[in-house]
Swiss-Prot record:
Its EC number is 5.1.1.7. Catalyzes the stereoinversion of LL-2,6-diaminopimelate (L,L-DAP) to meso-diaminopimelate (meso-DAP), a precursor of L-lysine and an essential component of the bacterial peptidoglycan. It comes from Lactiplantibacillus plantarum (strain ATCC BAA-793 / NCIMB 8826 / WCFS1). It holds the Pfam family DAP_epimerase. It catalyses: (2S,6S)-2,6-diaminopimelate = meso-2,6-diaminopimelate. This is Diaminopimelate epimerase.
Amino acid sequence: MAVKMIKVHGSGNDFYLLDQTQFQAPLSDADLKQLAINICKRDGAGLYDGADGVLVVDKSEHPQVLGRMRVINADGTEASMCGNGLRTVARYLGTQNSQEDFRVQTMYADLKVQAVADFAAHVPAYSVEISPVTFDAQTLGMHANNDATTIINEKIPALSADLKFSAVAVPNPHLIAFVDHDTLVGPELGRIGEWMNDGKNQIFPDGVNVSFVEVLGPNSIFVRTFERGVGFTNACGTAMSASSLMYVLLHQESTDFNQEIHVTNPGGMVKTVVHQGADEEYWMELIGNATFVRIVTLPLEDALQGDYSPVTATETGEQVAYEDFVANLAKA
């Protein structure tokens, strides 16, 4: 049986998009895990240049919803949400159904998505909702500071003597620290990220996404992320959304609710807007590219065994346009 996938990315956070409706019966969870582990390997061991994960598209039985998205990380674990991936799934479903404004089912919520103006020629963009938001330690799977119920801009002595952290789920868990530039690019993020995702630590036994954030100016931040199940990534959409929320809550001298925030990352740039509802619940808009790099086809049996010799691929040309867009960002 042949399997068709699309290599996609948002801000360089790259995935293989797999539409399960192409099969008579969906793949088992075990097969999805094995597929992700195989094709996502880097350093030439995976399919082409590997990926951060697999975006699994299925039909949804929810009303007014075009489809369902699941996220399988490169290590085979399942993530509850992926903002960058959601933009590419939104584009795929919108194109398939000739719609530009709809909802997509995710693990915890049916989220609003919408096509927006292209970032540049051949760089299509989408806006997606990031929610729900909670600071609850139990939901986060966090055990820190004598089992504090929340951690917002506080030191966690076991992690660092100097840095202050905020813990928030959007809905996947994030640990965020605002830092200076030297700390942003230094080794501390890798040390903390690896430790918090080793499966042995007692603070986040199930792991956590760790981000360092540098304030660049009014409504402008840089976010660098060590992603749970992936490691260092070019960008993490939920991390940039969570970082934007904490930026608004902790740095209102520089930004505020309902203002467009320019978020730079190692893979490019996105825009975010943080909203607060009447019931004081938060949600974010994540606005960024939804790039389709190539369409690949290969026998499923070979993909599950890590044999990519029979693969065929068609390049879309969009990656060149995206790289030009990023290069122009650097010149601005």
